[in-house]
């Protein structure tokens, strides 16, 4: 990939951002950039979206960012078939023994509604990617399937890449300000950049087998699980429903290091393995597809190299247990997209892009460890955990999915000693944490505070204070002075309020700021800063100027 990109005779195609890779993370990057008005091109070597049902667990934070991007409802429609499936079951077979529920419900007490307007969604990758693709195209994304990156070079002003159509063989030179590599765990972009990885490496190998069985639903009964770990030592595996009727996925352990070739997984052997695992010798099984895969625990040693950024599996690999992998990648893309938009739009400095690594890499390091610990706990087929893995920190799944924090980066006032994943889920307005969810009324419209955060930084200030307009007026002046698209809302119950909290909620207390205080929230919904003590009216403008210029790396 080191061939020179400025080949004579090529027409140069210019875009601000080139996205390499068009799976979940690449398509999500396209959607997020499109929402922010950033012109871009996405290239994907495969002919279309995924055809294999994998990567199905979309956690609540992922659904929040899809909500902000206007795509949540389309995803839920695509996921309607499995909307009633909950929990993780472990059992020796589906006959006789009811089994043990390792996790009966992600939100058994309904307490998640206190923290989020969204919820988990079980949508397989082959159903999710077409929704993202349609949305990306509607937003103006230039999506090129059957197109691969041949080479790229970067200089202080941008990236020059050569892409090749796998259909026509035609080469095109692309000149971009930035390149986002969402090109998978074997990332050629990462390899060319010479970026190493940390972590123990490969954890286990499986073969994913899709099959049809009309009778299997009889033995599953009303146990509508997300996944069932079948623990027959002679034929273990993980069973997942596709439609709860006749289409299923079975993950069988594969031991390539034991010289067991992939060719051993014939249709006949796979069908026999499934029958023994389920406990029904005469079960009807029609194999429809097979795909090998491996789980690993690796994190890239850096996420940025000049004008190139790693996202998704190119940046980190983790065990699928807990459904953290694709979710972490999608949230990488969400973190990066607004920063690229800000720098390209001229309202943030280049230093803001350095915070992508500072924020997202510690999250991946913490999450990969917890994913491996969950694989050990759930005895994932084929996983022989290294010593000490099962004793690693896990935390509640919501703490990992929703409660993670950025102790450093584009935040001001965060405690650098704060663990990335907290012991308890609070979301109480701490800088570096996802901003609190509160229901508000705006001119008769009901909305979550999270619905306010996408296209610009947002300042929330107290409309019921002694000087209710001080923060707001300072924000308006600074937006013009600094050319920052800062949006300001006065929150309270007075006549001048822009937003009114529901149910007598004390919004300042929920955000951890005093009466008369203010909170700055980033476009990705994370708290950038909050006032910790009362600020005199005449000090609001210099205070806010310092916050904005620091967070956005201006000046």
Curated annotation (Swiss-Prot):
Q: Where is this region: Disordered?
A: 366-395
Pfam families per record: FAD_binding_3 (PF01494), Rng_hyd_C (PF21274)
Cofactor dependence is on: FAD
Give the residues the record marks as binding FAD.
Answer: 16-45, 303-313
Q: Which UniProt keywords apply?
A: FAD, Flavoprotein, Oxidoreductase
InterPro entries found in the cross-reference section: FAD-bd, FAD/NAD-bd_sf, RIFMO-like
Record has Oxidoreductase as a keyword: yes
Give an example GO molecular function. Answer: FAD binding
> Is Flavoprotein included in the keywords of this UniProt record?
yes
Q: Which domain of life is it from?
A: Bacteria
Q: What is its EC number?
A: 1.14.13.-
Q: Which family does it belong to?
A: Belongs to the PheA/TfdB FAD monooxygenase family.
Q: What does this protein do?
A: Involved in developmentally regulated synthesis of a compound biosynthetically related to polyketide antibiotics which is essential for spore color in Streptomyces halstedii.
Stated name of the protein: Putative polyketide hydroxylase
**Source organism of this protein record:** Streptomyces halstedii
Instruction: Show the taxonomic lineage.
Output: Bacteria, Bacillati, Actinomycetota, Actinomycetes, Kitasatosporales
């Amino acid at each position: 990939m080191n061939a020179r990109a400025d080949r004579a005779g090529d027409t140069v195609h210019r875009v601000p951002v080139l996205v390499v890779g068009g799976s979940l993370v690449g398509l999500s990057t396209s959607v997020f950039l499109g929402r922010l008005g950033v012109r871009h091109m996405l290239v994907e070597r495969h002919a279309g979206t995924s055809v294999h049902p994998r990567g199905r667990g979309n956690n609540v934070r992922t659904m929040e960012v899809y909500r902000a991007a206007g795509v949540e409802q389309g995803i839920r429609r695509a996921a309607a078939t499995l909307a009633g499936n909950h929990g993780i079951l472990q059992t020796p077979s589906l006959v006789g023994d009811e089994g043990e529920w390792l996790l009966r419900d992600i939100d058994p007490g309904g307490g998640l509604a206190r923290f989020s307007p969204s919820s988990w969604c079980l949508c397989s990758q082959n159903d999710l990617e077409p929704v993202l693709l349609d949305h990306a195209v509607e937003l103006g994304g230039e999506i090129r399937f059957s197109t691969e990156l041949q080479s790229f070079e970067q200089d202080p002003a941008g990236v020059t890449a050569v892409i090749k159509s796998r259909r026509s063989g035609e080469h095109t030179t692309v000149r971009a300000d930035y390149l986002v590599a969402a090109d998978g765990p074997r990332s050629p972009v990462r390899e060319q950049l010479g970026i190493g990885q940390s972590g123990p490496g490969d954890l286990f190998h499986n073969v994913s087998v899709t099959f049809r069985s009309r009778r299997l639903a009889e033995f599953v009964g009303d146990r509508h699980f997300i996944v069932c770990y079948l623990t027959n030592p002679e034929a273990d595996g993980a069973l997942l429903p596709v439609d709860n009727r006749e289409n299923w996925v079975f993950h069988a352990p594969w031991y390539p290091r034991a010289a067991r070739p992939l060719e051993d997984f014939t249709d006949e052997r796979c069908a026999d393995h499934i029958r023994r695992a389920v406990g029904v010798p005469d079960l009807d099984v029609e194999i429809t597809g097979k795909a090998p895969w491996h789980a690993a625990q690796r994190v890239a040693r850096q996420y940025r190299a000049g004008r190139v950024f790693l996202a998704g599996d190119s940046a980190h690999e983790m065990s699928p247990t807990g459904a953290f992998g694709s979710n972490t990648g999608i949230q990488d893309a969400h973190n990066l997209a607004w920063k690229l938009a800000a720098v390209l739009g001229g309202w943030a400095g280049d230093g803001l892009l350095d915070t992508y690594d500072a924020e997202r890499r510690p999250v991946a390091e913490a999450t990969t460890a917890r994913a491996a610990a969950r694989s050990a706990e759930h005895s994932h087929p084929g996983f022989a955990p290294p010593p000490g893995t099962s004793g690693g920190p896990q935390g509640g799944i919501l703490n990992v999915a929703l409660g993670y924090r950025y102790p450093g980066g584009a935040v001001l006032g965060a405690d650098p000693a704060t663990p990335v994943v907290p012991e308890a889920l609070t979301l109480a307005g701490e800088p570096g944490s996802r901003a609190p969810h509160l229901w508000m009324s705006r001119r008769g419209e009901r909305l979550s505070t999270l619905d306010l955060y996408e296209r610009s930084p947002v300042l929330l200030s107290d409309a019921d204070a002694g000087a209710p307009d001080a923060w707001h007026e300072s924000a308006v002046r600074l937006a013009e002075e600094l050319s920052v698209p800062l949006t300001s809302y006065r929150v309270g119950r007075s006549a001048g309020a822009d937003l009114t909290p529901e149910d007598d909620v004390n919004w300042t207390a929920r955000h951890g700021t005093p009466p008369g205080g203010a909170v700055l929230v980033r476009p990705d919904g994370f708290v950038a800063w909050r006032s910790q003590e009362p600020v005199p009216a005449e000090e609001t403008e210099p205070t806010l100027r310092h916050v904005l210029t620091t967070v956005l790396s201006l000046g």
